[in-house]
């Protein structure tokens, strides 16, 4: 059963009523088809109203949904012959990041992504999708391998952020993230990044320096969580909803600001409602991106990536220049 979110409460009672009538029809000699059809029509109308008017905080809840498809869910649906690679060849293997070699419609590719768990046991094993330095170093090892063998790189971003623990800092968390940013900027193969859930801080950006950056419609991408921003700005984490509306963290906001290239539509209610259909939407956008990028040589790919990131923040720079005059 799909867990309902806070803003979906108006829909819950209607869904429950429809289900009760369907169950009653199975056991009683009564035809309630007409009543059920009316309720389903009412439910559809209400769903359209709710999902068409989602607030940034509503989208944060969807991005964090415990049943939202993960990197491995999409790998299973989009790629064939996936062979997972382990370890950073320096310290160990971080299961908060998965990566390996796969075929995408006959094209050899390298796939890398954050991986959170679906239950408590798996979340503990994968550290809730928050990587240690060895996770980022594993990702970079696979990226350099992909460059050596001319394989396109596809990154799935889904993390609250890099793990901030003492051990992670001792092993060079900030250096690992910075090294990824530096090296990804100069990769001579196509890099396509897709935010599929939460894109939190440097932990997300360490897999986010791509030629094309796409976001699922209800995903988020930000330097800090709404709770963290509220705690810093107003000394009150309970004001997270206000922070979410202020921070411009949604796909629509970031498309307007030029941070991302395309918004990938989600199935009604969020990707967790139908992972198969959601994978088809990702496939459509990914296929178009690779077709465009594979036409460029290595030097052109690096230049395109450089120009893309250089243009971010250009509007604010111009505004500051005008004020200075």
UniProtKB/Swiss-Prot annotation:
Tell me yes or no: is Cell division among this UniProt entry's keywords: no
> Could you tell me where this protein is found in the cell?
Cytoplasm
Provide the primary localization: cytoplasm
Q: Which BP terms in the Gene Ontology apply to this protein? A: fatty acid biosynthetic process; malonyl-CoA biosynthetic process
The answer on whether this UniProt entry bears the keyword Nucleotide-binding reads yes
Per the UniProt record, one Pfam family is: ACCA
Reactions this protein catalyses: N(6)-carboxybiotinyl-L-lysyl-[protein] + acetyl-CoA = N(6)-biotinyl-L-lysyl-[protein] + malonyl-CoA
Q: In which pathway does it act?
A: Lipid metabolism; malonyl-CoA biosynthesis; malonyl-CoA from acetyl-CoA: step 1/1
Top-level taxonomic group: Bacteria
Q: Which GO terms describe its molecular function?
A: acetyl-CoA carboxylase activity; ATP binding; carboxyl- or carbamoyltransferase activity
Q: EC number(s) of the enzyme?
A: 2.1.3.15
- Start and end residues of each CoA carboxyltransferase C-terminal domain: 35-292
Any single GO CC term annotated in Swiss-Prot or TrEMBL for this entry: acetyl-CoA carboxylase complex
Which keywords are on file for this protein?
ATP-binding, Cytoplasm, Fatty acid biosynthesis, Fatty acid metabolism, Lipid biosynthesis, Lipid metabolism, Nucleotide-binding, Transferase
Q: Which InterPro entries match?
A: Acetyl_CoA_COase_a_su, ClpP/crotonase-like_dom_sf, COA_CT_C
> Its quaternary structure?
Acetyl-CoA carboxylase is a heterohexamer composed of biotin carboxyl carrier protein (AccB), biotin carboxylase (AccC) and two subunits each of ACCase subunit alpha (AccA) and ACCase subunit beta (AccD).
What task does this protein carry out? Component of the acetyl coenzyme A carboxylase (ACC) complex. First, biotin carboxylase catalyzes the carboxylation of biotin on its carrier protein (BCCP) and then the CO(2) group is transferred by the carboxyltransferase to acetyl-CoA to form malonyl-CoA.
Record-stated family: Belongs to the AccA family.
Protein's name in the database:
Acetyl-coenzyme A carboxylase carboxyl transferase subunit alpha
Which organism was this protein described from?
Answer: Geobacillus thermodenitrificans (strain NG80-2)
């Amino acid at each position: 059963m799909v867990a309902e979110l806070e803003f979906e409460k108006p829909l819950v009672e209607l869904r429950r009523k429809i289900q009760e009538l369907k169950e009653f029809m199975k056991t009683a000699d009564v035809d309630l088809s007409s009543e059920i059809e009316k309720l389903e029509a009412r439910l559809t109308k209400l769903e359209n109203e709710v999902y068409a008017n989602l607030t940034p905080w509503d989208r944060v809840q969807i991005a964090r949904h415990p049943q939202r498809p993960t990197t491995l869910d999409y790998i299973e649906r989009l790629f064939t012959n996936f062979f997972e690679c382990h370890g950073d060849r320096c310290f160990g293997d971080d299961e908060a990041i998965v990566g390996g070699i796969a075929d995408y419609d006959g094209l050899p590719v390298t796939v890398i992504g954050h991986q959170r768990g679906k239950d408590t046991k798996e979340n503990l094993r994968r550290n809730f999708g928050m990587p240690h330095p060895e996770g980022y170093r594993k990702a970079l090892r696979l990226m350099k391998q992909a460059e050596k063998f001319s394989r396109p790189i596809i990154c799935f971003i889904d993390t609250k952020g890099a793990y901030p623990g003492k051990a992670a800092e001792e092993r060079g968390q900030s250096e690992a993230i910075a090294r990824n940013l530096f090296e990804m900027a100069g990769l001579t193969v196509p890099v396509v990044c897709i935010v599929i859930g939460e894109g939190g801080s440097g932990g997300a950006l360490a897999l986010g320096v791509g030629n094309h950056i796409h976001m699922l419609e209800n995903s988020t991408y930000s330097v800090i969580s709404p709770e963290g921003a509220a705690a810093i700005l107003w000394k009150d984490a309970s004001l997270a909803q206000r922070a979410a509306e202020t921070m411009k963290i949604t796909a629509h906001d970031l498309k307007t600001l030029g941070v991302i290239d395309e918004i990938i539509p989600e199935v009604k209610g969020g990707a967790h409602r139908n992972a198969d259909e959601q994978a088809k939407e990702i496939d459509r956008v990914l296929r178009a991106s690779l077709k465009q990028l594979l036409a460029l040589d290595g030097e052109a790919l690096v230049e395109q990536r450089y120009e893309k990131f250089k243009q971010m923040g250009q509007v604010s720079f111009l505004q500051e220049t005008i004020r200075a005059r």
